[in-house]
């Protein structure tokens, strides 16, 4: 529990808010930089450090550094423990109250972050801008210690900045002669932003949000017609870390782009001879599962394409679960099963995910590869190498999804990826938004992981396996491979609706919990087409992890 704050100093001109959660390692540099501000006396500003459910010595570390600067007024506040946005709001509300008590509407409410170091003139430049009439100010944010980022990440950030800058300039009204340029850069972030107390009151304060509160603050300013000045003279350097304290923000963006750069592969980079060497060195066994469906578009062609891999010894077995009423493919060395004979205690096969689950039960390989025989492709061996390559070359990878090199064409899983899966992922699981085709039916994984995951019996498995794998081993253990073009299989619109329903059901169970799903009790899918009204019961139940049986 923090002590009550003393009254503000009569000459107070600015309050600096610093939200912090477990920042013991970095907060010292932040406070040190704030203590050494030029062009302003220590009596004219104060620092409000908002401790947001810290479990380390963040507060003590900050106080220790502040003690080396006797004139610095550092006050500790308790945040609600609900994220950086809520903590920042606590600090801003306190700052507004303190400046208002002095009847100082022109006083500055400034914000930075505990992992950020401001320049020596950071405050004085902003106060000078406010004295000229600026109501809101965004600082320029640079990355420090970014040498460890994967190649291309810093370039991506710079390119995004240039695009944002052009968009910003297109929306700005021309400034009058002699007026300063309002947008010398594009940023307005919690790491460096400021607004006057009067402006804070005018927009109704900072919205209570766990993250991205700075973006919503910018929108609030725009709605009120409050111009934001973005001078390059206001600068800070923030951490280039990939694990942040907020659910959204710079660290998450850097982590996502770093993952895309580091964990996206191309099937052309993996040759048979090299993978054979990797397999022999690791003594890893490999199974391929080809779940046949009601219509056999390309099973025999796929089996023929895989012969070269089985003869070479890269693939140890090919497992083909077939529906009772479907065609029974020629062997070609494959182990062909009636899928009802696999795990018969669970009754008849209920759908796509159920077939995957039963195929996995018959596969003995330490790595299991799932290919889609319904999409005819004479390059299935090439695609198999692309999915197996990352798992054979990097032991820390556990799960790999494939994607086509061509853009989505509105067919099949590509359409569902764009219309259903991608919005869901970006909304609830943004760390996975780098997957190009999150619903791809071509994937590979280590059996130990796959056997620990539940399988929705229907098409929901296409997304649930990705979500569950990320939850179990982390996104760093997941990868994707560009497999090259593959013809999409047309899917009737009604079938896409059923698939979307199954995907949404599986995603809801993982996003909001099984209890929420049970309370909602998924019912039939109603289909009002051509003046008719019918219902279809979509299979949404789940098979238990094989490792639990």
Per-region residue spans from a language model:
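Conserved donor nucleotide-binding strand/loop of the catalytic core
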Residues: 60-103, 329-354, 362
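Acidic donor-binding loop at a coil-to-helix junction in glycosyltransferase catalytic cores
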Residues: 211-217, 459-467
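Short, acidic, metal-binding catalytic loop of nucleotide-sugar glycosyltransferases
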Residues: 32-44, 304-315
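Terminal low-complexity segments of carbohydrate-biosynthetic enzymes
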Residues: 256-287, 293, 298-311, 328-331, ...
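A conserved acidic beta->alpha catalytic loop
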Residues: 33, 51-60, 81, 322-329
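Conserved donor NDP-sugar-binding/catalytic core segment of glycosyltransferases
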Residues: 121-157, 379-412
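A conserved hydrophobic helix/loop-capping motif in glycosyltransferases and polysaccharide synthases
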Residues: 12-26, 30, 37-38, 49-51, ...
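A recurrent flexible, glycine/aromatic-enriched loop bordering the glycosyltransferase active site
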Residues: 169-194, 406-414, 426-442
């Amino acid at each position: 529990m923090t002590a009550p704050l003393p009254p503000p100093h009569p000459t107070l001109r600015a309050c600096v808010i610093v939200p912090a959660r477990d920042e013991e390692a970095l907060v010292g540099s932040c406070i040190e930089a704030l203590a050494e501000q030029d062009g302003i006396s220590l009596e004219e500003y104060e620092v409000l450090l908002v401790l947001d459910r810290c479990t380390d010595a963040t507060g003590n570390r900050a106080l220790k550094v502040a003690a080396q600067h006797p004139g610095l007024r550092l006050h500790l506040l308790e945040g609600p423990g609900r994220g950086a946005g809520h903590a920042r709001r606590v600090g801003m509300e306190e700052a507004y109250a303190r400046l208002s008590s002095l009847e100082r509407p022109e006083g500055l409410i400034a914000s930075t972050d505990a992992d950020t170091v401001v320049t020596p003139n950071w405050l004085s430049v902003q106060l000078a801008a406010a004295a000229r009439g600026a109501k809101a100010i965004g600082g320029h944010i640079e990355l420090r210690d970014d040498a460890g980022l994967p190649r291309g990440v810093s370039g991506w950030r710079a390119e995004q900045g240039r695009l944002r800058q052009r968009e910003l300039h297109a929306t700005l009204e021309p400034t009058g002669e002699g007026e300063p340029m309002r947008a010398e850069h594009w940023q307005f972030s919690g790491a460096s932003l400021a607004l006057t107390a009067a402006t804070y009151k005018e927009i109704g304060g900072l919205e209570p949000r766990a993250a991205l509160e700075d973006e919503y603050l910018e929108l609030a300013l725009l709605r009120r017609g409050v111009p934001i000045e973005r001078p390059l003279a206001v600068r800070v350097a923030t951490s280039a870390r990939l694990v942040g304290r907020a659910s959204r923000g710079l660290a998450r963006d850097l982590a996502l782009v770093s993952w895309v750069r580091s964990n996206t592969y191309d099937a052309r980079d993996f040759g048979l001879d090299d993978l054979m060497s990797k397999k022999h060195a690791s003594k890893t066994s490999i199974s391929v599962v080809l779940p046949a469906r009601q219509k056999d578009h390309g099973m025999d062609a796929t089996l023929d394409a895989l012969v070269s891999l089985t003869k070479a010894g890269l693939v140890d077995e090919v497992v083909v679960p077939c529906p009772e009423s479907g065609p029974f493919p020629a062997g070609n060395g494959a182990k062909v099963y009636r899928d009802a004979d696999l795990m018969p205690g669970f009754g008849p096969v209920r759908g796509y995910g159920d077939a995957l689950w039963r195929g996995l039960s018959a596969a003995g390989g330490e790595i299991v590869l799932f290919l889609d025989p319904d999409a005819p492709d004479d390059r299935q061996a090439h695609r198999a190498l692309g999915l197996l390559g990352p798992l054979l070359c990097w032991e820390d990878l556990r799960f790999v999804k494939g994607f086509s090199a061509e853009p989505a064409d509105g067919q099949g899983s590509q359409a569902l990826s764009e219309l259903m899966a991608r919005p869901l992922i970006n909304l609830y699981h943004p760390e996975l938004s780098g997957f190009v085709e999150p619903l791809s039916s071509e994937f590979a994984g280590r059996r130990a992981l796959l056997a620990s995951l539940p399988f929705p019996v229907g098409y929901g498995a296409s997304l649930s396996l990705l979500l569950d794998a990320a939850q179990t081993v982390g996104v760093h253990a997941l990868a994707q491979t560009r497999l090259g073009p593959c013809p999409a299989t047309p899917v009737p619109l009604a079938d896409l609706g059923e698939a979307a329903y199954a995907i949404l059901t599986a995603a809801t169970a993982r996003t909001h919990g099984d209890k929420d799903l049970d309370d909602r009790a998924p019912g039939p899918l109603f289909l009002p087409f051509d003046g008719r009204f019918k219902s279809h019961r979509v299979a949404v139940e789940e098979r238990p992890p094989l490792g639990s049986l």
